[in-house]
């Protein structure tokens, strides 16, 4: 893969996003980074630099239009046009429905869905103009199923899959690929911080497993499109 290709990854400082940043860098990509916490972003950029990976980024709330525009422009100015966008930022609030507040619902939709819309809207026009680019949306197997306490999360991930399917059909004629990655349970803070969810961390997926999958689909020939891909623990 040419070293001049640039990937912009949202939610980059922890979990799948962090693992993806390093996996892409090791594969020769330049990496654009963003997350809410400025100190976490600075630390990640320093660690990527120490690993010999060219990266740029800034703190951003990717559910806010102005901040999305600012971080996207910053990455383009520092690294060049975005060849791959990985919409990874996400939140999981697992509660029985009657305990789910409107604030919980709005935060889930803003982080998991609104951010995806805003970031895609920001980078897609240039991809279409260049007739080159890939958008990877990190969905979930919860986008096909449900689970107790998951009304907000599963609603958002069903929406991510619907968004991805429709956009894929819309932009493939412009040689832009849209891919939805659907992980099962992954050992990240999203699960560890939810007492309602129980998972054996020794048996579920690791962030690096999902990151390797993302790199794999990105490095397929440009004429090949894996529109959806499920990855799940072998024996959870």
Residue ranges: model-predicted function:
Residues 140:
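Residue(s) in the substrate-gating loop at a strand-loop-helix junction
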Residues 13-14:
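Conserved glycine-rich cofactor-binding loop
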Residues 173, 180-181, 196-236:
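C-terminal helical subdomain
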Residues 29-44:
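Conserved glycine-rich Rossmann-like NAD(P)H-binding loop of the short-chain dehydrogenase/reductase
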Residues 120, 156:
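Active-site helix of classical SDR
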Residues 38, 59-71, 102:
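The beta1-alpha1 cofactor-binding region of Rossmann-like NAD(H)/NADP(H)-dependent oxidoreductases
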Residues 96-97, 104-106:
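Substrate-binding pocket helix/loop in short-chain dehydrogenase/reductase
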């Amino acid at each position: 893969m040419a070293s001049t290709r640039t990937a912009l990854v949202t939610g980059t400082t922890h979990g799948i996003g962090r693992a993806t940043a390093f996996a892409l860098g090791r594969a020769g990509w330049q990496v654009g980074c963003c997350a809410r916490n400025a100190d976490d972003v600075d630390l990640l950029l320093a660690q990527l630099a120490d690993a010999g990976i060219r990266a740029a980024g800034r703190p951003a709330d990717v559910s806010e239009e102005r901040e999305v525009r600012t971080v996207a422009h910053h990455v383009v100015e520092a690294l060049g046009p975005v060849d791959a966008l990985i919409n990874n930022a996400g939140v999981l609030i697992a509660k029985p429905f009657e305990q789910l507040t409107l604030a919980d619902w709005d935060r889930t939709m803003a982080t998991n869905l609104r951010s995806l819309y805003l970031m895609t809207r920001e980078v897609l026009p240039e991809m279409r103009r260049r007739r080159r680019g890939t958008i990877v949306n990190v969905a979930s197997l919860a986008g096909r199923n449900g689970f107790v306490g998951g009304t907000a999360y599963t609603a958002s991930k069903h929406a991510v899959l619907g968004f991805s399917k429709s956009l894929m059909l819309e932009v493939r004629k412009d040689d832009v690929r849209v891919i939805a990655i659907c992980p099962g349970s992954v050992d990240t803070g999203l699960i560890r911080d939810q007492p309602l969810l129980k998972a054996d961390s020794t048996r579920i997926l690791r962030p690096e497993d999902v990151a390797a999958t993302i790199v794999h689909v990105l490095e397929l020939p440009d004429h090949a499109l894996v529109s959806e891909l499920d990855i799940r623990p072998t024996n959870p």
